[in-house]
Each structure stands twice: as structure tokens, then as C-alpha cells.
């Protein structure tokens, strides 16, 4: 999602794409390490296409995957109505952007060998909000076994269980907070 000119959001949920960068020459007998890039942008803006990893992939003999995922309210929106209408915990969470990232990691595990990558040597890395998302993946049981190393560049994280999130949602003053210390 990108912010439009007058405070409006433009975009689409049709954003679940990824890019795979490989060295120009790949040896069929050697599986390469995989780097899984999560862009920054406050989880409200940004896209995988902003980054060209082709030179990095060739220079260091890596397979690099950059992903798109739902952003803004399409990516992270908890509402009590989700709990009432959803049959599974994942949908109840409202963490759709994180679930998109996990889906992309599952795709990597199933398909990266076809691109010369080693599905047993995957490093997730991201900067800013992407770094925050790295921490979210580290703490998610749904991502267990989908990657092996992690690099967070300037990201931080906080987590809330569903009960805490619903209390935070119901607190009308929560929108007035200016510091993460105020949440604690």
C-alpha cells in the first residue's frame, strides 16, 4: 500500500509476489546459501522491487529472495470481530503481513532448490520494519524450521497476546501514546 496524495491509501491485497536473484552462472552440484530479504517502510510502505540484489547475488554466490507482503491495515489489523468470525488462531491475530512472510518462507523451502539455493541454509534479513519482522518471525512457532539464521538491521519488536491486543484496541487513549515506554 502506498499513501496517496490526500491521506488516502492506494494499493491492493494482490501484492504477494517475490523476486529471486541468482548468480549468472550456477553450478548444478553446489547449493548456494539463501538470503530472504524483508523491506522496511514502517509496515505501511515499500516494496521488494525497490531493491536489485543481482550484483550481490553474483558477487557472493548467493540466492536472494525479496518479498512483498500486505502492508498497513491490510497487513496488521486486529479487531474483536475477527475473533468472532474466524475458525483459526492465525486469522484471529490480524497479523496478515507476518503470515504472508511465513507463506513466502514456505514457498522458499519448497522451491528454492530449483534456483540453485539450499533450503537448509536460509537467512532472513531485513532493515527497519523489516528488521522488526525478522524478530516477529523468530518468535513465531509458525515459522519454525523455515529459516536457519536471522539478521535484523535497526529493527525492534514488541509482542502482545490476543487478550493484551484486545485491551489495547479498546483503550481509546492508546492512540495518544508517543513512546514505546508508555506501552510498558
Q: What are these model-predicted stretches?
A:
Residues 5-183:
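Serine-hydrolase-like catalytic core of hydrolytic proteins
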